Amino acid sequence: MSNKLLSPHPHSVVLRSEFKMASSPAVLRASRLYQWSLKSSAQFLGSPQLRQVGQIIRVPARMAATLILEPAGRCCWDEPVRIAVRGLAPEQPVTLRASLRDEKGALFQAHARYRADTLGELDLERAPALGGSFAGLEPMGLLWALEPEKPLVRLVKRDVRTPLAVELEVLDGHDPDPGRLLCQTRHERYFLPPGVRREPVRVGRVRGTLFLPPEPGPFPGIVDMFGTGGGLLEYRASLLAGKGFAVMALAYYNYEDLPKTMETLHLEYFEEAMNYLLSHPEVKGPGVGLLGISKGGELCLSMASFLKGITAAVVINGSVANVGGTLHYKGETLPPVGVNRNRIKVTKDGYADIVDVLNSPLEGPDQKSFIPVERAESTFLFLVGQDDHNWKSEFYANEACKRLQAHGRRKPQIICYPETGHYIEPPYFPLCRASLHALVGSPIIWGGEPRAHAMAQVDAWKQLQTFFHKHLGGHEGTIPSKV
């Protein structure tokens, strides 16, 4: 029997440690938690097809611990990466640690404790974490469980032209302060998929960035908007362009020469942006899609209600009432829904919980803030975090559905995610528990539990792509929710 490890998977990256470790024979049963056969796992890990002699499994006497990633080296942010370690002692306890610094230098970290199998190998797709930042079988846990070193920091990607680098380390032992470093590697996750074209948009009053797939067009067009933080965020649009859509990330305040506040917004600006997208030679009509989260989701509802040429809209934790400022369109005005700051609660950590602050748009003068969704001719998908503490997203989605159906409109699709907070991002972004709210002027909690929120993000990302392909043209079909 050969004592040499086979060469690693051709599409994997292997970094060898300078540290050596002796391994010894072991008499152990195979774990029932394995999802794969030993044979298929060995093919990924590059381990030999060891022959069992009686109850003794012979392993090499000395070998270097190595980290294996697939895809190798780098991949798109929304893609999973397979992580494995080989060259450990049988049943060796180890701690895996992931570290990432954002563009401002803020540190995010996660760690988990594991135990190698009888061959001294560890595959995160079949080995459960025994504790740490998470527990259980979570192959991508080291990413979605990342937490900021300092509180109130949300992971945001400002420049999609550069990747974020994740440092992965394998350390000996399970102690609170793990032992010596066994091996490490650097994994880059990019936001601009290969071949995707990035075109800044400065046409008339419109300020944004258009992302086009690498293939020949025309493509279904989507306008993408974020919330009250203002500025221009491109990372969702750039990732979505890699799925076959022409996506324009649209700024609407606090960016370049746009208004510095959103006290007054005019839908004519959004109409101009939509018309620009529809007139682009690589965008196919007859209508466009809208994608928005928070205030951006609310604006999707307003655009679909007042403007023509909108075929489909995805609203992520949006309000059915106009919030934060007055909205104008051709002589019509929507006032903002009222607020009562006396309804702010304070958490044990001293952060504000504002979920009850907004008045109901169903009562009294606040009824005038209700967006007239019954005018909309588009079809809707509402993605809802049931633990959203920014506002009552599930209530708003249900009220929009009632209003649409009462006026004979198509019933929207509503997908609700338990234990999911406000910021439903593309897959593998870590949960932001609390951060500064631009309108409130103080830190607030956003809601959500890390694992449930992470699973919701993976599902929501698939759902919105399927929805847009179905209603804007392209691949038809629906995906049953896994959450």
Swiss-Prot record:
Subcellular location(s) of the protein: Mitochondrion
Residue positions where N6-acetyllysine is found in the record: 104
Positions occupied by motif Microbody targeting signal: 481-483
Top EC class of this enzyme: hydrolase
Modified residues (N6-succinyllysine): 470
GO MF annotations, alphabetized: carboxylic ester hydrolase activity; fatty acyl-CoA hydrolase activity
UniProt key word DNA repair: no
Chief site of localization: mitochondrion
GO biological process entries: acyl-CoA metabolic process; fatty acid metabolic process; long-chain fatty acid metabolic process; very long-chain fatty acid metabolic process
Reactions accelerated catalytically: hexadecanoyl-CoA + H2O = hexadecanoate + CoA + H(+); tetradecanoyl-CoA + H2O = tetradecanoate + CoA + H(+); octadecanoyl-CoA + H2O = octadecanoate + CoA + H(+); eicosanoyl-CoA + H2O = eicosanoate + CoA + H(+)
Keywords tagged on the record: Acetylation, Fatty acid metabolism, Hydrolase, Lipid metabolism, Mitochondrion, Serine esterase, Transit peptide
N-terminal signal peptide: none
EC number: 3.1.2.2
GO cellular component: cytosol; mitochondrial matrix; mitochondrion; peroxisomal matrix
Active-site residues, record numbering mapped to chain: 294, 388, 422
Pathway: Lipid metabolism; fatty acid metabolism
Tissue specificity statement from the Swiss-Prot or TrEMBL entry: Strongest expression in heart, liver, muscle and kidney. Weak in placenta and pancreas.
Similarity-based family: Belongs to the C/M/P thioester hydrolase family.
Role, per record: Catalyzes the hydrolysis of acyl-CoAs into free fatty acids and coenzyme A (CoASH), regulating their respective intracellular levels. Displays higher activity toward long chain acyl CoAs (C14-C20). The enzyme is involved in enhancing the hepatic fatty acid oxidation in mitochondria.
PANTHER family assigned to the protein according to its UniProt record, in alphabetical order: ACYL-COENZYME A THIOESTERASE 1-RELATED, ACYL-COENZYME A THIOESTERASE-RELATED
Self-association state and partner proteins as the record states: Monomer.
The protein, known as: Acyl-coenzyme A thioesterase 2, mitochondrial
Lineage: Eukaryota, Metazoa, Chordata, Craniata, Vertebrata
Gene: ACOT2
